[in-house]
Amino acid sequence: MSSGLWSQEKVTSPYWEERIFYLLLQECSVTDKQTQKLLKVPKGSIGQYIQDRSVGHSRVPSTKGKKNQIGLKILEQPHAVLFVDEKDVVEINEKFTELLLAITNCEERLSLFRNRLRLSKGLQVDVGSPVKVQLRSGEEKFPGVVRFRGPLLAERTVSGIFFGVELLEEGRGQGFTDGVYQGKQLFQCDEDCGVFVALDKLELIEDDDNGLESDFAGPGDTMQVEPPPLEINSRVSLKVGESTESGTVIFCDVLPGKESLGYFVGVDMDNPIGNWDGRFDGVQLCSFASVESTILLHINDIIPDSVTQERRPPKLAFMSRGVGDKGSSSHNKPKVTGSTSDPGSRNRSELFYTLNGSSVDSQQSKSKNPWYIDEVAEDPAKSLTEMSSDFGHSSPPPQPPSMNSLSSENRFHSLPFSLTKMPNTNGSMAHSPLSLSVQSVMGELNSTPVQESPPLPISSGNAHGLEVGSLAEVKENPPFYGVIRWIGQPPGLSDVLAGLELEDECAGCTDGTFRGTRYFTCALKKALFVKLKSCRPDSRFASLQPVSNQIERCNSLAFGGYLSEVVEENTPPKMEKEGLEIMIGKKKGIQGHYNSCYLDSTLFCLFAFSSALDTVLLRPKEKNDIEYYSETQELLRTEIVNPLRIYGYVCATKIMKLRKILEKVEAASGFTSEEKDPEEFLNILFHDILRVEPLLKIRSAGQKVQDCNFYQIFMEKNEKVGVPTIQQLLEWSFINSNLKFAEAPSCLIIQMPRFGKDFKLFKKIFPSLELNITDLLEDTPRQCRICGGLAMYECRECYDDPDISAGKIKQFCKTCSTQVHLHPRRLNHSYHPVSLPKDLPDWDWRHGCIPCQKMELFAVLCIETSHYVAFVKYGKDDSAWLFFDSMADRDGGQNGFNIPQVTPCPEVGEYLKMSLEDLHSLDSRRIQGCARRLLCDAYMCMYQSPTMSLYK
């Protein structure tokens, strides 16, 4: 096979890429123009379709004796651009491309591609699927469970899908990972009990235990398959009513899961008849099917042309998107039995009626009433159709079926369109009203030849200022909503059209093609083509002007019905049942938008059910405060904290106001758009803007007091400790660094020991519900660890001694200190006097009244895969926990809105009652509900003093 290699340079301006992919069926020999070396591109390589900007399409115009070629960028050699003959490639859809690209051996990749049933079943393999894994060739397969599905490195236009499998039974210990890939934890399992493999090494275990084994085919199996009875691009006919219609075969094969029914044929009709989109049962069988003119029928309903006819220029028609090239399917084709017969047999197949609704005759117009959008001259938005004279012969269509079962925001998801033709009273074929995406702009289809490449788009918008990228609406009942992806004027039409990508699938729509020409690319059944003058700005939003970016969209569009209140009155947090009723549900908490989860979750933790920092909201402005101090404080108090406590909801618009203020700080940037760390946010807000008196005052080894707003635990991992508590971690850190609190804090924010967002020092951390900081305070009376009397000395070297209150800070009275350090192992210990308050009442400690300084846990901030969520305690009961996610759900697509949600998670209380030993032995994957995230993903734990929270 020969092909032209244009260069080994990076593909930039000369081409633009589309998300269409092809598999090479023949080996390529190409020359690198830089090195003049011959490069081999093996069969089984995958290329991405590219288009030449200068000519508007990727095919090299055919000359006499030469066939069409298409341009490809080989994914394995991303700088190589080459042209290949159409016959030497086959198109595959993106989902199959992802599965195949993970297989590095091109021969094995091609073999799996030809085994299309196995490949189709690969789409069913997901997290939780039971599988068998072939680790080494010729050896037995090991059972396992899929724990991860996705790309390992997302660095290409499309990335290969790998499967992370936890090996079970005899496979345990035979793997090579614990779920970590290049330092990133993709799933969790025991050491050497996990593997990352591609689909060719997997076998899905199904209910009947057959799995994919019967479908597995090696390269040698594929040559024994019967070829289909009809060749691609061959001409055929079929009876439609009383007339005969002709077309070209673009698909001929058995249907996945329906092999016993025999062959089915996809025909691209010469006239606009049919409504097959190339899919069957969710599997794309043919990528060149057009809902405007393609039909799928059983082979019994097809009549091959017996006489030579002049054909249309052949389309790029292959067994594509999961279907192999002719004769290369690896499962057995059906024999000529009762289920199949010679093409042209006139016994209508049962599945013909199943796939196409009914027979294509006059009865169809009775059983399948089409619906179309009528033209209303008074409202230009209604003028979506221009009926040809043929339409006058058809009786008016009835009203569309009732759609009351759909919610108002979902009614436009699907419409009962029909794309067939009905016989006219005079015997000719008259158009029935077609879908909005076809008939509203079709005109006389036969007067215009098939357009191979899109015309240049028209850059200017309409009178409403609509342009490419605008949120638009096509006013109908119900209306269509979407984003304009293309504006232009196709050949043969006098009107300027707009190509919209709809929010949801709609029957009769395409994937970006119109009349056989691709104008943009989107998901199937989401591309709608209408006259530009019929479009209006999306009426669901307050602003009619398009916005330039996500930052301004948050404000100018007002987020529809997602605005929140402004509350001037100072409001303490509502606790227990009252707080629960206010806060739980969807559209509760703080709405996330554009990488704001770090800020949403931190604010929710600090203020939803705690008043520990309320003084921050009340301090009057002083002369040294910055100019926007009052603006920030007022925003926090009246638009965020108070509404959150009264109504349980704050919209993203208010948070964006705060993010813009954070951007004003000279040392800060990216707060309106980038992902940030909570500690960075707290430092900017508390230190630079609000000038909050530092929450913590810490002294190191008698040195000057250091001020800070939160404390991060730094320590080396102790392999002897399975699940540490926050109490242990804080004490270890203070002892090892020789630190003390100079004052008892009213609010203590502790950052967990971890490096960055990904690496955790401990797999689980137990969030102590109560924190005793008495032994960590300066000038505070403390109990002797032995007798309970007033401690006079502290010994850091005794801390690790397992014989004396293991894992506790050691302080002793004078007598006990002498006794303890008489032991030979402790003779050389260096202990120091405990600092005590000068005015300590003598009778207090003599009567055992040494007070304890304790703090209560009120919130935990967690992170998993760069997304922050929050756990908050709303009452005294152990089960009084709520889980908050600012981006729990979504309304709409790319230009939609996040929906925050707060849910009760009482199961947390049960896990916090468990012993540390039981918690350590518990498999993290078996932890129910949200509790796993609390125990495994803690980022910050927040404590408050029950007696001081309103005074500091």
Curated annotation (Swiss-Prot):
Residues 106-589 are annotated as: Interaction with TRIP. Residues 777-829 are annotated as: B-box. It is found in: Cytoplasm; Cytoplasm, Perinuclear region; Cytoplasm, Cytoskeleton; Cell membrane. Its EC number is 3.4.19.12. The modification Phosphoserine is found at S383, S414, S418. Zn(2+) 2 binds at C795, C798, H821, H829. Residues 153-198, 253-286, 488-531 form the CAP-Gly domain. This is Ubiquitin carboxyl-terminal hydrolase CYLD. Residues 588-946 form the USP domain. Residues 327-346 have a biased composition (Polar residues).
